[in-house]
Amino acid sequence: MKLLLLTLAALLLVSQLTPGDAQKCWNLHGKCRHRCSRKESVYVYCTNGKMCCVKPKYQPKPKPWMF
């Protein structure tokens, strides 16, 4: 039982220490990926050439035209 708990603790520690799946972008609200998910859209491109996938609620709203 102790070996099982030690193994689980080690796996939890390793999973917290390894970096995430994607680089952060757009003020930490987006992720740099090759493809965006359905709920995300591309607003800018990352420095590594990938797309910065951002959820629409974090993208700036377009301002109306002033005449």
Curated annotation (Swiss-Prot):
Transmembrane segments: none annotated. It is found in: Secreted. Its main location: secreted. It holds the Pfam family Defensin_beta_2. InterPro entries: Beta-defensin, Beta_defensin_dom. One of its GO terms (cellular component) is extracellular region. It comes from the Eukaryota. Residues 1-22 form the signal peptide. Disulfide bonds join C25-C52, C32-C46, C36-C53. Keywords: Antibiotic, Antimicrobial, Defensin, Disulfide bond, Secreted, Signal. GO terms for biological process: defense response to bacterium; innate immune response. Has antibacterial activity. Belongs to the beta-defensin family. This is Beta-defensin 36. The gene is Defb36.
